[in-house]
Amino acid sequence: MIYSSEPIAADKVVEAGVIGTGQYATAIVTQAQSIPQLNIPIVADTEIESAKRAYQLAGIDDSQVIVADTRAQALSGIERGKKVVVADPYLLMDLPLEVIAEGTGDATAGAVHAATALQNGKHVVMITKETEVVVGSLLRQRAQQAGLVYTAADGDQPSLLIALIDWCRQIGLEVLCGGKFGEQRIFVDLPNQKLHLSRNRTLTLAQEQANLFHPLIGPNNHSHLLETTVERQSLLDQLIDIRTDDLIELGIVANATDLRVEKERLHH
């Protein structure tokens, strides 16, 4: 699930720490500057310059950013209103933070960071999809037992799909299936009867195959539409590379919604 709550009080500021400075985690640091009720006083990354870069992208002057090697140094910096960068993510666990956002992109590290944060009474936002799909359910159970919140991060395809499914169910609709836009793009070149695929692959279509990709117009002939769709799917299933991102993201959705993965290579 994606955790949501009632709006927090106008004068409440959530203190959160970020581990990892990939694209998504860095976006949290930069966007926090536009959210009065969110403060990111500390960022951890094994590459200190990457952590500094996150604050630079957020418009924070270098004079306001310090590097800390110990908890005492980090705490002193936070208390003085500085932005702190550290190489050791475990320094965040014993600081006055309510939430840890884990964004290393490493499944094992993400699991250990999240488990440690929960042990130290921190809520956890899991950005690392590789961790969420493997042990997210277990971490969520631990959080619930401790009276804490563990949630996947909002804003990416899995969370948006989960939210849509939840909304449909809340208004009484039965959800039969769910899906997302695949990571692999296929470009249909009808004039030249070609399909352009990933890794610079091109497939020349026979006329009968090319006809499958013409717009389906004309009388509302259900059997024709179904037949054409099935034939398209049969052709594409032989060509599409299954991307890890697709498997991970739809695995997250399946875990969160109780929809099952019907086919190992997914439907396309």
Model-derived segments and spans:
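Conserved beta-strand edge residues that scaffold enzyme active sites
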Residues: 47, 106, 131-132, 157, ...
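Glycine-enriched alpha-helix->loop->beta-strand junction motifs that scaffold or abut catalytic
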Residues: 96-97, 121-123
